[in-house]
Amino acid sequence: MDNFILIISCIVAGMVFKTTKSIHPEAHKGINTWILYIALPSISFKYIPKIEWSLQILYPAASMVVLALGAYILMQYYSKLKNYSNRSTSTLQLASGYSNTSFIGFPLISAFYGEEYLSIAIICDQAMFLTLSTLGIITALQGGNNNTISAKFLLKRLFTFPPFIGCVTALVLSSFIDLSPAEPLFNKLSGTVAPLALFSIGLQLKFNGWKKLMSQISMSMVYKLLIGPALILVLGLALGLKESLVKITVFESAMPTLVMSSVIAEQFKLNTKLTNMIIGISIIVGFFTLGIWYKVLEWCF
């Protein structure tokens, strides 16, 4: 419950500050800079050293990639039918393929299934983060003004993107150095991601013209909250995997849109208005669809 109150409080606070002009209109850019350069890399240093590498992590890790690739393909096809621009296409792909696996996911996994299953949720979260830092950035780059992107340019942007650098550095250092003494620092820094990202969304959130965007919002949420998790469930059932592994992975994939999608969209000059609307509405609708998914998963197993 605390997390849900925090979600509402931070978004509303951002909207109030924007409406009353109590903050600089470009303040969200400074906030996003902190998130990208400090807070997000700290998440990698907090969780990656704790991952136990085994065959068991393949399904939850691969599922997050499948979820993102499914959104990429479906939104590419949908946008072509609707004759959307590259910018709109990339925005939809970014807003549809990445789940809020930690800030919303962790407390809901604990509430529905118990804290002992958070180990699976953490694998989902880190796989989602790694996918966002790679495929997500490639997707965002494709929505830029340049129709063609050279491999050299793409690799340069990818390898200079702070969260990606954080992931790679954490992977390498944790193999040689015990990072546990610095864990309290990483806990505090990573803890700033959710409230600041939500506050930033509130600063940018606009509902004027939502009717014109409803078809895009609806398509994004249908995939994010229904089709995507269904794909992951079918994959798990087809492979005959352990019940708890499939349940937690599917439930994580059914979470609302990742808040960080807004920060990436702003960084690469995509349609932040559409992204923020999808995030806000998916959080509300997602609470209902997650209840449905819980019942479906109980029935399946």
Task: Kindly give the residue locations of the regions a language model identified.
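Alpha-helical transmembrane segments of multi-pass small-molecule/ion transporters
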Residues: 1-301
